[in-house]
């Protein structure tokens, strides 16, 4: 019985330490671009990305998408209008990214070398997030930027 009583204060001390660490990481805010990159990586791990205009438009039409990322330099104006209209209809937040290669890298459409650098990146015009995966500081930062 006395050993169980000793474990309870130690567990409380560990919880207090974790809370202090969370407060320290919360003090350095992530930029919207960094948080978007982190959210897309977590969604990719949890199989929650619809990559490409076809998959993304289907997810938006079914109202399964929680977030949509569109490339600004898309050469097909009809694609841009379609995605913007579907996002407006379902009130899905829309983020625009300048370069399709960056979006393709964030969506996992690349090959990583031994050092973890992206090679052979395929450009991507549109990505829809259907499952965020686990909750994170980056997700909260991104969602709060849409609320503002």
From Swiss-Prot:
GO terms for cellular component: cytosol; cytosolic small ribosomal subunit; nucleus. One of its GO terms (biological process) is ribosomal small subunit biogenesis. GO terms for molecular function: structural constituent of ribosome. This is Small ribosomal subunit protein eS12B. It is found in: Cytoplasm. There are 2 genes for eS12 in S.pombe. Component of the small ribosomal subunit (SSU). Mature yeast ribosomes consist of a small (40S) and a large (60S) subunit. The 40S small subunit contains 1 molecule of ribosomal RNA (18S rRNA) and at least 33 different proteins. The large 60S subunit contains 3 rRNA molecules (25S, 5.8S and 5S rRNA) and at least 46 different proteins. Keywords: Cytoplasm, Ribonucleoprotein, Ribosomal protein. Component of the ribosome, a large ribonucleoprotein complex responsible for the synthesis of proteins in the cell. The small ribosomal subunit (SSU) binds messenger RNAs (mRNAs) and translates the encoded message by selecting cognate aminoacyl-transfer RNA (tRNA) molecules. The large subunit (LSU) contains the ribosomal catalytic site termed the peptidyl transferase center (PTC), which catalyzes the formation of peptide bonds, thereby polymerizing the amino acids delivered by tRNAs into a polypeptide chain. Belongs to the eukaryotic ribosomal protein eS12 family. The lineage of its organism: Eukaryota, Fungi, Dikarya, Ascomycota, Taphrinomycotina. PANTHER family: 40S RIBOSOMAL PROTEIN S12.
